[in-house]
């Protein structure tokens, strides 16, 4: 219940006291119900209230009825204004939602639009020349307009990586082979040195034995 509706009820109660008649809440609600009845026009309302009050008091109720109609008209006007405001706000909210949805759809479309087509003619020429120079199979750009490598270039990169990897493996294999060869050469040299030492030791042993034999022969002669 609005503030003005409460004030109207208070006015009815006060007026009934002035009429020196029943001012109970039941009577107040009854009169308030008549004045609020949207199915009746103002004349019908005045007639109904006047007839009711005539059964309760002999005092003239014309001014009272007119004042109630004026106050009730203000209540109706306030409600209509409030409803119009609600409808206006609702319409604005709906328009805002539609606008936001439309803008969102536009943003999505712009997001997936190829930036290449937004370039100037000169920018397109430069881009095409770049694509041709580096042998791209197809032109493609991301959302920022940067070139995305085609499958051909990706494959070439993979092949280059494989070649580099293969070269690395070959270099490792050569290094290992060289190390093994160096070990074999070292072992061979060490073996030759050992053979030479053994040979020299054997020759020395033979010389010593020959020397001993010679000494023995000399002793026998003596």
Swiss-Prot record:
Record's keyword terms, sorted: Coiled coil
Compositionally biased spans, kind Basic residues: 213-222
Biased segments, Basic and acidic residues type: 112-126, 175-212
Coiled coil: 80-111, 168-222
Start and end residues of each stretch annotated as Disordered: 102-126, 159-222
UniProt cross-references to Pfam families, sorted A to Z: PWI
Keyword Coiled coil: yes
tRNA processing listed as a keyword: no
Record family assignment: Belongs to the CCDC43 family.
Protein name per the record: Coiled-coil domain-containing protein 43 homolog
